[in-house]
Amino acid sequence: MTRAETTKFLGKLLTDTRLGGAGSHWASEVSVDPWTPKARRVDYMEFSPANQCSVSGIEKGIFTCYEIKSCKEDVYSGNGLNFFGEKNYIVTTMECYKDILPDFRSGKFANYMREKHPDSSTYYGIMVAVPVWGEATEEFNDPTPLSEDRNWKLEIVLPCRQGIRTKSMTELLFCMLRSGR
């Protein structure tokens, strides 16, 4: 697959398998701080209220941001990696994960984030595409090439701890609403 095809594939996999369940609300291409020098766009943003039966349940909801990255070059392109949620994930392929894993272990990725994306949260994890019948550990050793003729799932290979959010709930919900979907 080309880079564009991989990005489209991962985005569809995310929306089909992770977003939109009962009580979950999401939007794509969410613009944050538009018309300012700090304008950013998040590939996908999800809001999950604690419950939908009370005001406090809604107010206790959390935002999860997802950035789709097709390869290591895409990760370091300077585009994306805009993390404004309590939880944030890079959604990628196993090949890309294997390519960036040494950078995570050495601290290179954290340094890159501090330098190039200082407004982004430091709370992030990684999800990779894995065949439905497979396990992430098996795929790490022998990745299956991406193809549309196979059933896939997203598996968390680097969990994200829940962190703090620097944008208000009202602002992020408005940004999601403005994006349309």
Model feature map: region roles:
Residues 37-65, 79-83:
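Active-site beta-strand-loop-beta-strand hairpin of nuclease catalytic cores
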